[in-house]
From Swiss-Prot:
Keywords: Autocatalytic cleavage, Cytoplasm, Hydrolase, Protease. It holds the Pfam family Asparaginase_2. Belongs to the Ntn-hydrolase family. Cleaved into an alpha and beta chain by autocatalysis; this activates the enzyme. The N-terminal residue of the beta subunit is responsible for the nucleophile hydrolase activity. The keyword Cytoplasm applies. It comes from Rattus norvegicus. This is Isoaspartyl peptidase/L-asparaginase. The gene is Asrgl1. It catalyses: L-asparagine + H2O = L-aspartate + NH4(+); Cleavage of a beta-linked Asp residue from the N-terminus of a polypeptide. PANTHER family: ISOASPARTYL PEPTIDASE_L-ASPARAGINASE (PTHR10188:SF41), L-ASPARAGINASE (PTHR10188). The lineage of its organism: Eukaryota, Metazoa, Chordata, Craniata, Vertebrata. One of its GO terms (molecular function) is beta-aspartyl-peptidase activity. The active site is at T191 (nucleophile). It is an enzyme of class 3 (hydrolase). CDD domains: ASRGL1_like. In vasectomized rats, autoantibodies against Asrgl1 are present.
Length: 333
């Protein structure tokens, strides 16, 4: 199992004290999906994209934005980047179409919004937030979600403009190989996500995906499902997950990780226990990012790789593979 943590000693030394007695740090952690090894030709682009997304989220927090603002902003950046399987660059289903899923949650009051199987929306995470804030519901799907988007003034983006040459070739390759995705081989699992802690101690998560390549039409995975694709609760923490969607759904991975936090485990221990359970029970591989209410964070995965980046106290850390962490200070101005 691979782990990225905020210090060489394994975790921050912040004690688990009541929120009123601590100085809340601004924290943003993002991931670009747990999958097979990323080709050398793409690593630089992926690293650059994930670092930009984390920086965007952190800058939103620095400017006084909320945790919800930060995770939406970070995930929007990744949806707009063709190197990631969300928004522009989403993988294609068996019919060669895009069907995207996303969810978002505010840990302050457990407000949540999600959409699934949307086609002509460039930024599904923005639509998920509107579901959270402008409807009495938590989840809209397919045509209903797209009608709601039109009602909210979100412009339609022709599906063909969201499709890239890389995703076309990816689908062709999968059809030739005739391989259904196995739980222990998440080569087609791409998801993006973010978690954040703001200056008021509020937590949030957002997750967005194009799903798995060559999936059945109408297939919905874990990403839009609250508790599986992510969860946020100010009393516990915030999580965004990635990996084999069916396995993540079956174990409710995000809430499972926070259950272990609730039982007094560190973020590292909680992530390990949750991912190990999914692997031992279902052979499911994946990853997650997790922040607790005091600002401790971890990025952990059982898949071959997982692009991630985190910003805390003005310091950016990022990586893709095990033992590959780069650190730099962000500009102070």
């Amino acid at each position: 199992m691979a782990t990225a943590r905020p210090s060489s000693c394994g975790r921050d030394s912040v004690p688990a004290t009541p929120r009123a007695s601590i100085d809340v740090s601004l924290v943003v952690v993002v991931h670009g999906g747990g999958a097979s090894n990323i080709s050398p030709g793409r690593k630089e682009l992926v690293s650059e994209g994930i670092a930009k997304a984390a920086t965007e989220g952190y800058n939103i927090l620095k400017a006084g934005g909320s945790a919800v603002d930060a995770v939406e902003g970070a995930v929007t950046m990744l949806e707009n980047d063709p190197e990631f399987n969300a928004g522009y660059g989403s993988v294609l289903n068996a019919d060669g179409d895009i069907e995207m899923d996303a969810s978002i949650m505010d840990g302050k009051d457990l407000s949540a919004g999600a959409v699934s199987a949307v086609r002509c929306i460039a930024n599904p995470v923005k639509l998920a937030r509107l579901v959270m804030e402008k409807t009495p519901h938590c989840f809209l799907t397919g045509r209903g979600a797209e009608k709601f988007a039109a009602d909210m003034g979100i412009p339609q983006t022709p599906a063909e403009k969201l499709i890239t040459e890389r995703t076309k070739k990816h689908l062709e390759k999968e059809k030739l190989e005739k391989g259904a995705q196995k739980a222990d081989c998440p080569k087609n699992s791409g998801t993006v996500g973010a978690v954040a802690l703001d200056c008021k101690g509020n937590l949030a998560y957002a997750t967005s995906t194009g799903g798995i390549v060559n999936k059945m039409v109408g297939r919905v995975g874990d990403s839009p499902c609250i508790g599986a694709g992510g969860y946020a609760d100010n009393n516990l923490g915030a999580v965004s997950t990635t990996g084999h969607g069916e396995s993540i759904l079956k174990v409710n991975l995000a809430r499972l990780a926070l259950f272990h936090v609730e039982q007094g485990k560190t973020v590292d221990e909680a992530a390990t226990l949750a991912l190990d359970y999914m692997k031992s029970k279902l052979k499911g591989l994946g990853g997650l990012i997790l922040i607790n209410k005091t600002g401790d964070w971890v990025a952990k995965w059982t898949s071959a790789s997982m692009p991630w980046a985190a910003v805390k106290n003005g310091k950016l850390q990022a990586g893709i593979d095990l033992c590959e962490t780069k650190t730099r200070n962000l500009p102070t101005c």
